[in-house]
From Swiss-Prot:
This is Probable UMP-CMP kinase 2. NCBIfam families: UMP_CMP_kin_fam. GO terms for cellular component: cytosol; nucleus. Its cofactor is Mg(2+). Consists of three domains, a large central CORE domain and two small peripheral domains, NMPbind and LID, which undergo movements during catalysis. The LID domain closes over the site of phosphoryl transfer upon ATP binding. Assembling and dissambling the active center during each catalytic cycle provides an effective means to prevent ATP hydrolysis. It comes from Arabidopsis thaliana (Mouse-ear cress). Transmembrane segments: none annotated. It is an enzyme of class 2 (transferase). CMP binds at residue 144. Belongs to the adenylate kinase family. UMP-CMP kinase subfamily.
Amino acid sequence: MWRRVALLSPMISSSSRSLKLSQAASGLKVGESFATDIISQEERVSPPKEKAPFITFVLGGPGSGKGTQCEKIVETFGLQHLSAGDLLRREIAMHTENGAMILNLIKDGKIVPSEVTVKLIQKELESSDNRKFLIDGFPRTEENRVAFERIIRADPDVVLFFDCPEEEMVKRVLNRNQGRIDDNITTMKKRLKIFNALNRPVIDYYKNKGKLYTINAVGTVDDIFQHVLPIFNSFEQLKESSHVNPQSHLGSSLVENSS
């Protein structure tokens, strides 16, 4: 029996040496083969990284026509439309603790903290199956912008600014409201003054980052939209859902990119 073991020992030793040589030839140390198999299996089953959402901010003064253009963008490219104001109103209507706090702030004439608004936006971004978003009328202030970057940890892909002369915006709002002209003019001038004071730093910030597209918002709805289309057609992730000709050309007189 001992002789049989002695005879087998060289064979076992030889097999071991062969295994070592085979693994060495393939760049593996003894014992690494099994671990490598496990790693490769884990790589195969690990889920792919989730794509970052496509985010568009839409800015413009009261009467600039941005709301109408938002509707056409959503319809054409399949983006999900988010409005900070709508989200706040919905939270109030749901009678949540957060909604009660928002309502009390508004009743007291206080500004809703940026963090509250951004977290409502974050909730929509995370719960939606859509990965393309159009955020209307946001950010209104530098504080909004900073809070968005800090909480969401993302930059917008596109920032649209519908630039419209003050006289045209006043005329549009007065025609729309059909109320007392003196009161409306006074209110409009106050709103425009606030918009310019708060929004201008945001607009300048994104202009310096090369993300701002300034649209001349004078003209018919369809004419203006024809100069919005090429901006979105230039992004591959939007072409699949686009219902327009991707060869549309940009009218240089109506749109300006700050990049």
